[in-house]
UniProtKB/Swiss-Prot annotation:
Disulfide bond residue pairs: none
Native species: Homo sapiens
Name the UniProt record assigns to this protein: Testis-expressed protein 36
Transmembrane regions listed in the UniProt entry: none
Sequence segments annotated as region (Disordered): 1-52
Parts forming coiled coils: none
Pfam families reported in the protein's UniProt record: HDNR
Biased composition (Polar residues): 24-39
Length: 186
């Protein structure tokens, strides 16, 4: 099938995909020295070595001859099958038990004037909270079956003595008639 108005390639090349017209299949994606991993010209590494400062060459020679005292611990394979390598100087520095603060046997480090009390372990909010016992009327429903029965259980103050009662500052504003409540429950 032909493609486009002005460009009509032959139909025998249908299905072949190239980034540009005229490329052959044998051309690799990239011909740089990094992808082929071979330098194209042998004199390029010598030029790079010539540009390096002389201190770098001296350090490189010293590093080959150096035998570091702590290189014994850097070898992972030598520590593979040994189980006591944490005691042989690796890891964190061990602090003597007398100077440790989290598990100290020194009485003077952790002793203070604090006297333990029964409120230890409680937050300030838990200590200051005062629980008020609510009076629960068991016959009270959200939507009562019969309003008259429930309201008859309460004896209200007469209107005349209302001001007199308020002057005395009563603790209970209404009372429950227990006979009526017990008859409602049964």
């Amino acid at each position: 099938m032909t493609k486009g108005r002005r460009f009509n390639p032959p139909s025998d090349k249908d299905g072949r995909w190239f980034p540009h017209i005229g490329l052959t299949q044998k051309t690799p994606e990239s011909i740089t020295s990094a992808t082929s991993k071979e330098p194209q010209s042998p004199h390029l590494p010598r030029q790079a070595e010539g540009k390096l400062p002389p201190i770098y060459k001296v350090r490189e020679k010293q590093a080959v001859n150096n035998q570091f005292p702590f290189s014994v611990h850097d070898n992972r394979h030598s520590l593979e099958n040994s189980g006591c390598y944490l005691d042989s100087g690796l890891g964190r520095k061990k602090i003597s038990p007398d100077k440790r603060q989290h598990v100290s046997r020194n009485f003077n480090l952790w002793a203070c004037d604090y006297v333990p009390s029964c409120l230890d372990g409680f937050s300030n909010n838990q200590i200051s909270y005062v629980y008020k016992e609510a009076m629960v009327v068991s016959s009270f429903r959200r939507f009562p079956r019969c309003y008259k029965e429930i309201w008859n259980a309460f004896t209200f103050l007469p209107e005349r003595s209302y001001t007199e009662v308020l002057k005395k500052k009563p603790k209970v504003r209404f009372t429950v008639d227990k006979k009526v409540v017990s008859s409602l429950e049964s």
